[in-house]
Amino acid sequence: NAYQVAKDSGDFMLARSFLFGDYVEPSAMLNSFRCQDPQNESGYCNPTFDGLLQQAADTLDGNARTGLYHQAEQLLMDEMPAIPVYHYNQMRLVDPTLRGLPVQNLKGAIATKDLYFSQQ
């Protein structure tokens, strides 16, 4: 449709989009704003931002990586290529004897093969 064509070509002032992190690490979300990232729907491109993410990916020092991610996030906040309007939220009522429910479940998928009940 016309909306999707305009969005795909970058011919928009405001468009709806969504982003999920596939893993628990800042780069899961931040990489989508790199200049050449295929998931960069915003058109945002800042070589300084890309450089900070590359430095973070290259370092083994966790504290240094965190600092680099903070700098990259600050650039996004200063330049605001996307406006977070809402966040997905999932709530579930779970029997207290249910075990095997994943704790870090980013996309909400539950593998029922891992579930079981236990009184302990």
Features from the language model and the residues they span:
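Short acidic loop-to-helix transition motifs that present clustered carboxylates
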Residues: 1-2
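Detector for C-terminal structural segments
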Residues: 5-120
